[in-house]
A protein has these predicted regions:
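Active-site neighborhood of HAD-like aspartate-dependent phosphohydrolases
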Residues: 1-27
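PRPP/pyrophosphate-binding module of the type I phosphoribosyltransferase fold
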Residues: 3-4, 114, 263-362
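Substrate-recognition element of Asp-dependent hydrolases with the DxDx(T/V) motif
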Residues: 17-70
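A short, structured active-site edge motif that brings together acidic residues
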Residues: 57-74, 218-219, 244-258
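Conserved Lys-Pro-Asp/Glu-containing loop-to-beta segment of HAD-superfamily phosphomonoesterases
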Residues: 78-101, 302-308
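Acidic, Mg2+-coordinating phosphoryl-transfer loop and its flanking beta/alpha structural elements
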Residues: 95-130
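PRPP-dependent phosphoribosyltransferase catalytic core
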Residues: 132-173, 318-399
Length: 399
């Protein structure tokens, strides 16, 4: 909540947000430390929380001013207390706030932080929203999905997830209506990048993947270099919400890889060696673009979330997986989409090699194939995603 005079225009939007919560059956909770007052139409100041109780009867307020058993905001105990009282798990909740204290509270509670900048903008943590309507759209179109992954492969330490199938074929209209947008977003920064990264982030959050990782990395593009400029910002923001480092330079493309389209046009045969022989790891990567590690962080006992946009046969992701696993660390692999009717093909034994050096492999065998149809576990996910993309593009306050 803000201090001082309330902006009537903004408060009207907040009222719409509260009405939206009620309409969707969502329970709002306010966690507060400080005493605050409100002055209406020249009347004497009155307790803000009493006013909010009257104005928003569906709102539950937790504050030490009313109950000394409630722990101080910012402490881990504060969110634990609220979650326990409400009967919620942390990844069933989002935290809307704007202050540094809000950020710390969300971080200590392992809760996804939505940064409301319409009152103030005092931290660079969290996903930024400039007005209540943006928050409502995010919740309505991304958080309230019921089908978070269309593809799931879990085989021992091997884990892979995808939001939905990928196809731009006119014969697959259910897939095509979102696949064109996704490809434009992933390859050219067009389409609706915010929707796709929002879908990825919420799927990972609400299925608890963030609880099982230590670091996040994006698989680099085909050109020499590191990182993925379409995803880096949101992946780092997601990681910072839970104190998971984003390692933009963990995987380096030391030599340009041939694109599949270029290979097809020029009739150049390529396989998984096109990826294995063009990447290497950085032993001392950079955390959140600021801090260079002095000791190798990716090692036994750690797990890296490795993210790519569109997966065809899995050669790129699996090359990254094999290099990371050579350090002793584990991986969880996630992509926006999975190409239809194409199996995920894992890479076989690579012998002894240095993952931090450029390598030239030959004759590396393929390992298991994970059938497309067998691991397409939720056919409704694609329909829901397409419908929610359309809703996202045209969203307005419910009538």
């Amino acid at each position: 909540m803000n201090m001082g005079k309330i902006d009537a225009t903004v408060f009207t939007e907040v009222e719409k947000l509260m009405a939206f919560f009620k309409l969707r059956g969502l329970k709002p909770v306010l966690l507060a430390n400080k005493r605050r007052t409100i002055t209406l139409n020249g009347s004497a100041p009155r307790d803000l929380y009493d006013y909010l109780d009257e104005h928003f009867p569906e709102l539950t307020i937790f504050t030490r001013l009313r109950d000394p058993k409630i722990p101080f905001k910012k402490t881990k105990a504060a969110t634990e207390y609220v979650l326990s009282e409400m009967g919620w798990e942390s990844n069933e909740v989002v935290y809307i706030g704007s202050s540094h204290d809000d950020m710390i509270t969300a971080l200590h509670g392992s809760i996804l932080f939505l940064r409301a900048t319409w009152y103030s903008n005092k931290t660079d943590y969290g996903f930024e929203f400039s007005e209540p309507k943006e928050v409502a759209r995010f919740i309505d179109t991304l958080c309230l999905r019921e089908h978070f992954w269309s593809h799931e492969i879990i085989d021992g330490d091997f884990e892979y997830y995808a939001l939905a199938p990928f196809s731009t074929s006119p014969y697959k209209p259910t897939f095509a209506k979102y696949s064109h947008n996704a490809r434009a977003a992933a390859k050219f920064g067009q389409g609706d990048v915010d929707f796709w990264l929002g879908a990825l982030v919420t799927s990972m959050y609400f299925t608890g993947i963030h609880k099982r990782i230590d670091f996040i990395a994006a698989y680099p593009g085909h050109s020499e270099g590191v990182d993925n400029d379409k995803m880096c910002g949101d992946l780092m923001t997601f990681g910072k919400c839970f104190n998971k480092g984003y390692l933009h330079d963990l995987i380096e493309r030391h030599k340009t890889a041939i694109k599949s389209q270029t290979a097809r046009i020029n009739k150049i045969p390529i396989d998984h060696h096109n990826q294995l022989n063009t990447i290497k790891l950085n032993k001392l990567p950079t955390k959140n673009y600021k801090t260079v590690y002095k000791k190798a962080p990716v090692k036994k006992g750690k797990t890296v979330l490795l993210v790519d946009d569109i997966c065809t046969a899995g050669w790129s992701l699996d090359a990254g997986r094999k290099y990371i696993e050579k350090t002793g660390a584990k991986t969880i692999l996630v992509t926006w989409l999975k190409t239809i009717n194409t199996n995920y093909c894992s890479i076989g034994g690579m012998g002894n090699f240095d993952p931090y050096e450029a390598n030239t492999f030959a004759g590396i065998p393929m390992d298991k194939q994970y059938g497309y149809h067998e691991y397409h576990v939720d056919g409704v996910a694609s329909e829901e995603l397409g419908d929610h993309l359309e809703l996202y593009l045209d969203w307005d306050w419910p009538a």
